[in-house]
Amino acid sequence: MEMPPCALGLFCFCSSCFCLCCPRHRPVSRLAVAAGKRGAAVVSGVTGLILSPSPSPIFIQPTPSHLTFQPPPGLELALGSQSVHSAPLGVTSPSAPPLPPVVDLPQLGLRR
């Protein structure tokens, strides 16, 4: 079954991304127009924020089904045999530089 073309002559593929110029997605398109970027922004499906202006139609990226962190392929090779989350929370890495000492404001001659 062929999808009907949207208002810009493109085809609406509702299974992956939602073309907001398509008649079935008009309410969201009006919301994007209210933001001042008619047909020229990418809207995140996770946060709803306009990510970047572009000359293409407005698309909503689908929300991922899993929200767990998965390192990109090859990251394990770059880090060696260490895991990305190798140290428990609260434990500092020995390779991290020490933090500078805290300086009190009166020592600098500043008044509050």
Swiss-Prot record:
InterPro entries: HEV_Orf2. Residues 93-102 are annotated as: Interaction with host SRC, HCK, FYN, PIK3R3 and GRB2. It comes from the Viruses. A motif (PTAP/PSAP motif) lies at residues 94-97. Forms homooligomers. Interacts with host SRC, HCK, FYN, PIK3R3 and GRB2 (via SH3 domain); binding does not activate the kinases. Interacts with host AMBP/bikunin and AMBP/alpha-1-microglobulin peptides. Interacts with host HPX/hemopexin. Interacts (when phosphorylated) with capsid protein ORF2. Interacts with host TSG101; this interaction plays a role in viral release from the host cell. Interacts with host SIRPA; this interaction down-regulates the phosphorylation of host IRF3. The viral particles present in feces and bile are non-enveloped, while those in circulating blood and culture supernatants are covered with a cellular membrane (quasi-enveloped). The PSAP motif is necessary for the release of membrane-wrapped virions from infected cells. This is Protein ORF3.
